[in-house]
Amino acid sequence: PYLGSPDGFSDFMSVHTGIKHVFCSLSMEEGRYNFSIMNYCENHLLYFHGVPNVCKGFPRRIWHSMVGNMPILNLRYEPLGKMENRILKRIFDIALSGIFLVTVFPFVYLIVGSIIKFTSPGPILFKQMRTGLNGVDFVCYKFRSMKVNDEADSKQATADDPRKTRFGDFLRRSNIDELPQFINVFKGEMSIVGPRPHMLSHTEIYARLIDKYMVRHFIKPGVTGWAQIHGFRGETKELSQMGGRVKADIWYMEHWTIFLDLYIISVSYT
């Protein structure tokens, strides 16, 4: 438990980095503290829970649940917060990624890999650290679509990026470059459907610039997602575009069903 004034909350949390859940029992008269603590949690990948007597201090819709005999308030309803839903989604991911990796991917790898090696010096696969579930970094796989360069981990690819190879441009436009991420799915680092993972430098930047950006990391990143089928994909020239992507990702978190995943997959690959 945290013992002290609300003013010292952020300092306390910066020292005690192992905490994941914050329970707030401030009165409604202290609403400004509720809002401050709530925003801190949203932007630092922490679960916020409010004890019922503070419900009037929240400026937004809230959800209630029970921890033992104690009712608590949550900032959103998350279907994947339930163990049975996470198990269902994981079984779905293993089944589809396993079938794809055994039946289709070997032929894709042979053909695409041969063309990559023939047209551009360097490895077939591009490996990059991305931000995943709960803010944990992981190695994300892609077919290499660019010339080997020193800006891969810092500079976002653009439509007319001179680093792209001719074949790489086709890979990116067709999304074939993303297919090795089914390896990440099978390993449990990603899901077939979820928020797209971003490079570490972009996570650091957007976490400061976009409110609630880190919320999207409460679930596994995906090969495709709700944001992508609604036009939020590829290069983000303006901050508002990334803001729209984050809103779409959070909507997906709050409305997940296995049927929604099936719909997103059908739209993405047809």
Annotate each predicted stretch with a short phrase.
Residues 5, 68, 80, 84, ...:
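Residue-level signature of the cytosolic catalytic core of signaling kinases
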Residues 1-102:
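N-terminal hydrophobic signal-anchor/signal peptide
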Residues 55-56, 61-64, 125-166, 224-247:
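Short, glycine-rich, amphipathic interfacial segments at transmembrane boundaries or analogous
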Residues 80, 84, 88, 92, ...:
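Alpha-helical membrane-protein architecture signal
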